[in-house]
């Protein structure tokens, strides 16, 4: 768990007087870091009794061809480019905006695999 609330220090380094303590809703979680491998999902409970599906590993993607609007299920071979972090390419981590090599060709990921539990992508011409 990671605290995502306000810092307890000023920009000068001095401590702020806190009117209250930390709250559970201010906690975040570690990133999913979706890898290219056999499918592995994890359900995470969220606010209001809902749930999020964390995609930990995936080897298929829903790839849409923008020219004709058709969507096919295609196998993911590797991660080609990732603007979020250059080291993610080496580790084959899929995030939104990363370019993956599929059987249909190179595609840009449009979904958030760690939040949505699925890899959706659009073919790059």
From Swiss-Prot:
InterPro entries: Ribosomal_eS8, Ribosomal_eS8_CS, Ribosomal_protein_eS8_arc, Ribosomal_Se8/biogenesis_NSA2. Residues 1-34 are annotated as: Disordered. GO terms for biological process: translation. The keyword Membrane does not apply. Pfam families: Ribosomal_S8e (PF01201). Residues 1-23 have a biased composition (Basic residues). Keywords: Ribonucleoprotein, Ribosomal protein. Disulfide bonds: none annotated. PROSITE patterns: RIBOSOMAL_S8E. CDD domains: Ribosomal_S8e. GO terms for molecular function: structural constituent of ribosome. GO terms for cellular component: ribonucleoprotein complex; ribosome. It comes from the Archaea. Part of the 30S ribosomal subunit. PANTHER family: 40S RIBOSOMAL PROTEIN S8. Belongs to the eukaryotic ribosomal protein eS8 family. This is Small ribosomal subunit protein eS8. It comes from Methanococcoides burtonii (strain DSM 6242 / NBRC 107633 / OCM 468 / ACE-M).
